[in-house]
Amino acid sequence: SAGNYRRMTLQSAKIDEFDAFDLKIEKSADPFTLAHKRLEGATHPKILCGTTPRIKGLSHIEKRENAAEARLNYRSTCPHCQVEHPLMWGGGHVAWGFKWDREDPEGTVRHHCPHCRGAITQADYLAHWAGGVWVSDCGNYRCHYVPGSGPDGRDDYYWTDGAGMRLLRPPRHVAVHIWTAYSPQTTWAAIVRQFLQCVAAKVAGDKAPLEGFINETLGET
C-alpha cells in the first residue's frame, strides 16, 4: 500500500516483478516514484527494478528503460568476423538471428551474426560467452565484468567509453535487457519448439501463447 511505502526510509530499494504493480498505488503515485522518495537522504541511494515486461505503453519497466542514460545488452565476439553482437531473435524478414531448417527445427537451430551472417550453435556460444561485455545501444558506454579481480578476490567490474578509455563517472541510470537465449539452463532447441507451438496456436485462433512468448521468452513488451 502507499502507507507502507511512506513508513520506510531506505539506503537502497529493489522492486521485483515491476510490471505486476498497479499503475498507481492507491491513487497516490506510481510504485517507482513512491520507492524513490524513500531513498531521499540515503548516503549512496540505489534502486533496482526487474521484471518480465508486459503491455507496451503501460509497462513500468519500459518507462524506466526509455528514461535510462544507457541501455545495455550483452555482446560477445563472433568467431567468424570478430565483431561483437548480442543474441537477437531476428525473424523471417531478416537474415540474422535464430534460423533453422523446417524439416528439423530443433536439431538445426543456429544463431546468425548480424554482421557477417556466420552461424553458431549454442555450444559454440557457451564456449566463448564469458569474454563478452555489456554495451550501450548508443555505443558510448561499456561495462566490463572481471571475475575475481576485486578486493579479497571478489568479482568486480569497470566502465569504459566507446573508445576504451576508463570512465571516472559511470552512467547514473542504466537499463539492461536480457532474455532466455542467454541462459545455459534453457536450450535453443526448446525456445524454437515453444515458438512453433505458439505460432500453431495463433493460427488456430489463440494469440495468448505467442503474446506470452514475446513477454516471457524474448523479454519484450
What spans do the regions from the language model cover?
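Short, flexible loop motifs at catalytic/binding sites
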Residues: S1-T221
